[in-house]
From Swiss-Prot:
The modification Phosphoserine is found at S7, S27, S37, S40, S44, S49, S71, S130, S479, S488, S492, S500, S1132. Involved in poly(A)+ RNA transport. Involved in nephrogenesis. The modification N6-acetyllysine is found at K786. It comes from Mus musculus. The keyword Nucleus applies. This is Nuclear pore complex protein Nup133. It comes from the Eukaryota. Forms part of the Nup160 subcomplex in the nuclear pore which is composed of NUP160, NUP133, NUP107 and Nup96. This complex plays a role in RNA export and in tethering Nup98 and NUP153 to the nucleus. GO terms for molecular function: structural constituent of nuclear pore. Residues 1-36 are annotated as: Disordered. The modification N-acetylmethionine is found at M1.
Amino acid sequence: MFPSVSSPRTPGPGTRRGPLVGIGPTSTPRASRRGLSLGSAVNSPVLFSPAGRRSSVSSRGTPTRIFPHHSISESVNYDVRVFGSSLPVKIMEALTMAEADEQLSVHVDEGGWACLVCTEKLLIWKIAVSPVTKLSVCKELQLPPSDFHGSADLVALSYAATSGEVHSVQAVSVMVATKEGSIRYWPSLAREDTYSDTCVDLGGEKMCRFLTAVQGGSFILSSVGSQLVRLIPESSGKIHQHVLPQGQGMLSGIGRRVSSLFGILSPTSDLMLASVLWDRGGSSFYTLTSSNISKWELDDSSEKQVHSWDVHRTLKESITDAVWGSESNYEAIKEGVNIQYLDLKQNCDGLLILAAAWHLGDSPCLVYYSVITVEDNGNQMSDAVTVEVTQYNPPFQSEDLIACRLMVPNFSSQMTYLYMENAVFVCSTGTGKFSLPQEKIVFDTQGDGILGAGSCAGVPILFSRNSGLVSVTPRENVSLLAEDLEESLTSSVGGRGSESMVFETTTKNETVAHEDKTKLLKAAFLQYCRKDLGRAQIMADELFSSHTDLDSDPELDKAVTQISVDLIDDYPASDPRWAESVPQEAPGLSNTSLIILHQLEDKMKAHCLLVDFLHQVGLFRRLSSYPIRGTPMSTRLLLCEHAEKLSAAITLKNHHSRLPDLVNSAILLALNKRECEVPNSLTPADVFFREVSQVDTICECLLEHEEQVLREVALVSQEWAEVAIDVNTVLKDMLQAATHYRLNKSSMYSQEEVLGKEPEYVPWTATSGPSGIRTAVMRQHGIILKMVYPQADSKLRNVVMEQLVALIDCFLDSYVSQLKSLEKSSDQERYSSLEVEYLQKRSELLSPLLTLGQYPWAASLAEKYCDFDILVQMCEQTDNQARLQRYMTQFADQNFSDFLFRWYLEKGKRGKLLSQPISQHGQLANFLQAHEHLSWLHEINSQELEKAHTTLLGLANMETRYFAKKKTLLGLSKLAALASDISEDRLQEKIEAMAEQERFLLHQETLPEQLLTERQLSLSAMPVLTAPQLISLYICDENRRANEYDFKKALDLLEYIDEEEDVSIDDLKLEILCRALQRDDWSGSDGKDDPIEVSKDSVFVKILQKLIKDGIQLSEYLPEVTDLLRAEQLGSLKSNSYFEFVLKANYEYYVQGQM
């Protein structure tokens, strides 16, 4: 129900950093160690030891008590009570008689029995959750002789009864071992005098360490050196024993996660055994050594080792990164980190490893206890490792004194208990959706101490030397908020216990003021944090019930936004340095952590709980929008923005510890711009980090400081180089933290059904204007490329370029988020204008990378943001055709090929366009369908000759601009047809059709050169002329040398005039003949009486002769002689009687002569 919340620093996949704060008066909290992984910063609120708290235990409320147990230790969040009935008399006597320094140990078995090892005796008694009136069963057994103190780790109970039944005395068998290897076995606890002894020969091995009851009533004895012996009692009393196989069965059926083919350690290895684990459900036995985890599968009499995983390298890296990952000298630190594995347990998430880590170079040197979760996937371990660094960090004293054990009382829960000699520390694995507060509970009264631990019916049980069996369980109403934050939230709504009264009093009025609604919603939120969901639901429903039928409620959006802002900008009023600086109207969400980083992380947890509260009570789905930065913004995304700024602030604070001069300078500039005064009792950092909503104002100030240093400091100085790197780092990490949170937590801020149309989403990382983040990134882009890069050496160039690319990535990602919010919007004009702006900025940012030859970085960004122009330019500049082909495949669904082909066309690179590999021929053909003037080349190259013929013929038919081009296209089409596989009949038909076109073109090709020169025409540049245009040229006056051939061509061209053309063929024929008649002199007969003889050399008569020769029937072809004589085109010839005589004579001679 309560989700985990992320901090903005992620050490790696699956890792988790827990809050690191000292527990107890001798510990020193270190802000730089407070690193949490993304996803865990607020799972565990900051809690100091109970002695340091302001509030009393009673102030947290009184839990319901089922049984009359009495509390034996004060704890804020947990009930520490005597468990079950009073101890048996024998147990109390043994505790009373034991010397103060005598080594006692207890084993609490989950089967409902407990064992106390005391000198030479073993006391076993029955325990139960509920107290009973009769005396508990208690048996006293004699231990086998030994030179060493006995240990409860070498006591094991096996049960004959099936799971779930009450284990009677008769059903319990007991086996004990001494450290030397002596074994004693009681088949039934009911007959304590009946037992059998044997001895295990360890072959010079070190001491025995653990004895574990396993499958089929058998046991496994484990030595310090990790040798394992299976002990199987027989009904005769004999105990059969054999060594477990190590290194067998590993070469078949297992995964390759084994670190080495022969990674199974031999029994003679120097590795030290840390812990063993029996998984009853999976019939699996695990061992944890200083280097590896091994797993065996067992049946009643045999074993098979199925896995051995070298954990040390992986776990050391994960733990080291989780604890010291934020340190500036991390690379140097990690070499000196010491790791010790302490215990191995199991829960629903996998195997749990308890580890301690310390670094002797730390001052002070603390021991960091971590709980690591590793999933067992059957025959191999998962690569994902979750590291929860607990808040238990005692000072390091000696490696020999590191003694801590792990207890997991409930398999289905993530709650864990770390216990040592005089204290227990309650925490969680960090893998659950939420976690209860971490707390250390001390057993340090005189003579007290923890002798052992275990669980019964899922209840965690400790055995205290003074109090006996003790349970440690969470209080029923423990709040999920850090205590101080929860207390101040309570005070903001009127004090503890007044939430309901305030609510009931206020809601009696019909109209509730907005301020009251905000206060009442806080009160409901507080109930939720105390896990009273029912009350929180009632309060939320009553508060906004009048608007349940409406699409949205502006009052709800306003109240939610106000609470969220109040939370992230909370005043740490309990910090004495802030006491005089908190305004009277402060919202009352104060916390008391004196460390800024802790304050930010507590705010993050509270903010996450606020969002989860809104989901749980049904208010989140009713959120609409709220104005921010002058425009409306979806309220759900505004809540996400607040959490993003918390992530960014946590990141900035981590850099503040590493780069105090830079960050402090920027903080001072930011506070001056905002006109914020810094009280004498506070530092500028205190004031700045308090107001998280304004954390983005530091970006502009970082750049101002950087520019000043670059101007004033000498190029050769180290400061000149470092300032650019440091500013880049801070900006980059802040923006990446925000973006990472936005992406990872998107489901947390999503709505199943969005109310109406959401406004455009402008993330705070996408703000423009003088102080906007986009403006800052563009400005830094210019600073790096103009001021730093030209002066830097190769090493510095590589560093700043990598950082700059990360900044550009954040910049472009914000545009993508903004564009996605407009995809479903009806405002396409806004989408289009923003897209144009995005494409322009993308080009401005990436083009310089190409210019500088930073091809890998340019490629990474251009690939991510699909800047195809950059990708093509890069491949052309580097002549990398293989990469181009890869992009065609990679971006096939985004038409990269079309973009590339179009780019080639625009750049005039037609050779490259048409020389694509066969794999791209299909896409090229599709592209060239819209570019037929090139597609025929591709078709010829692809041997598609008939298709090329068709394309060329189509181009020739459409060509009107250039005669020469039309003639060439027609000729190529003819050649393609002749070279194709077209059938003979179809080929002949096509050739004839093309020949007809060629005959027409021949009329233009044979225009007299004199005429072309006169008209200033050239065949190579002439357009394609129509038949009437050609006729006009052939018969025009400029064609002074025109003869019968020219006029015959003009008459022939009449056949090429389409019916669709608005031209009268008869009128045009009449004009041609009139023009021909005008070419001769018809003034006299020159002394000749025969008109036929006189006119035989005229152009007109020669035309008639050619027509007759071509077989044309003149009577049908020529106009009537009367029509010809009346034609206006004859001009003066119309009135020439001699011309009329001769014309009629020739008509009679030639026309009638054909009849």
